[in-house]
């Protein structure tokens, strides 16, 4: 089910507070956050967030294309190493 239209988009209060401070100070520093479930709001355009993936902070530059999506979508938590191939045994003559 999708979120009710009556409710506003979820954004953690500390993420809003950090973003408001960055907007007020006009700094281009990376804002490190752990809240992967927060929705990217229109006021975040131009800011860079470091989204935690469990090990490191992945930088996410907010543009108008990604407004309305969640921060966690841009910070993968698992590394894809490729599909397992056939392990063919080589025979010597």
From Swiss-Prot:
GO MF, one example: structural constituent of ribosome
Keywords (A to Z) from UniProt: Ribonucleoprotein, Ribosomal protein, RNA-binding, rRNA-binding
Gene Ontology BP terms: ribosomal small subunit assembly; translation
PROSITE patterns: RIBOSOMAL_S19
Keyword Ribosomal protein: yes
One GO CC annotation: small ribosomal subunit
Function, as annotated: Protein S19 forms a complex with S13 that binds strongly to the 16S ribosomal RNA.
Family: Belongs to the universal ribosomal protein uS19 family.
Record-given protein name: Small ribosomal subunit protein uS19
Protein's gene: rpsS
């Amino acid at each position: 089910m999708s979120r009710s239209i009556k409710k506003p988009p979820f954004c953690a209060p500390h993420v809003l507070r950090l973003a408001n401070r960055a907007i007020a100070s006009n700094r281009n520093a990376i804002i490190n956050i752990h809240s992967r479930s927060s929705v990217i709001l229109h006021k975040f355009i131009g800011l860079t967030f470091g989204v935690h993936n469990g090990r490191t902070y992945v930088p996410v530059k907010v543009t108008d294309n990604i407004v309305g999506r969640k921060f966690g979508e841009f910070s993968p938590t698992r590394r894809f190493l490729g599909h397992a191939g056939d392990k063919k045994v080589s025979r010597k003559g």
